[in-house]
Amino acid sequence: MIKVFPRFDEDLLVRLFHKGVKAQWSTADVDWNDPIQFSPSQSLALARMLTPVYLGEQSAMIGASVVLPQMANAGETSAQLYLSSFLMDEARHFEVLTNLYRRLGAEPLTIRQMPEMLRYHNRLRKGDRLDWVWGILISDIFAKNFYTLYAKAQPEALFGKLSGRILRDESRHQAFAEYYLKRSIPQVSGERVQALMGMKDELLGIMESMYQRLYADAEEVGMDGRGFLDRLRTDIETKARRIGLYDALPPSGRGPTSVRTSTSSPEPSANPTPLSFRGLKSSRCSTCFLALLCQTPLFQRAQCV
């Protein structure tokens, strides 16, 4: 239940909240006349490759709005406070990338063209708040690596400058997720930890499938897609060890894991608080990705009614 005067710990999450408040920016701060530095064909390829990241910003915005009251009910006041600034960040990224698509003169892929995006989105909303934070950390590592490429390669171009701004926000998101998971993982069962490891492998498998669809686009912009995925996998495994996932595994499960391409999902916690989207209404428009998600039978069966 929501408390009138909850316990309020001045921990890292509160400090991250303060940093987020001071670091706010908007589309009005962006010079949209900055050069693109892409040919028309490269702009189209970038628009396609950016699609999973773009949808991820929207998905994170919705997921945070569902998780926030769960944290309030659990008495996690500082996490609740931080997540409020996280919501603002994700909303800003969504708006900025929408404007970028207009500047590129291109549109993102549709769910029909890349159905793996819907699988990824649905996996993040399955389970409880611990599942969600772990999924967000994995997604943020992907986004960080993607944005870093362009922040370094095109520091004076429009997308390079946008990437630099977004990376500063993403660094806070990763710090939040890492702190929250480090604090939570020692309190869960070995079976629960194995489920989180399985979730990691499943999300990496979905990313692999998305890469197969975007291979030609990566080639068009000169991106080493295979090298990108290999570095991503290494970074995620490093983070998994840092937050204590491997240390918390039962002895029989401490061997190295491999990426699974199966679409099956690990079981969530025994009594999870599901990230229900029951409060959302099916969209009647067709102008955003969330509308496309809402119009799919799979999403409607997932309580989006």
Regions flagged by a language model, labelled:
Residues 1-289:
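Non-heme di-metal
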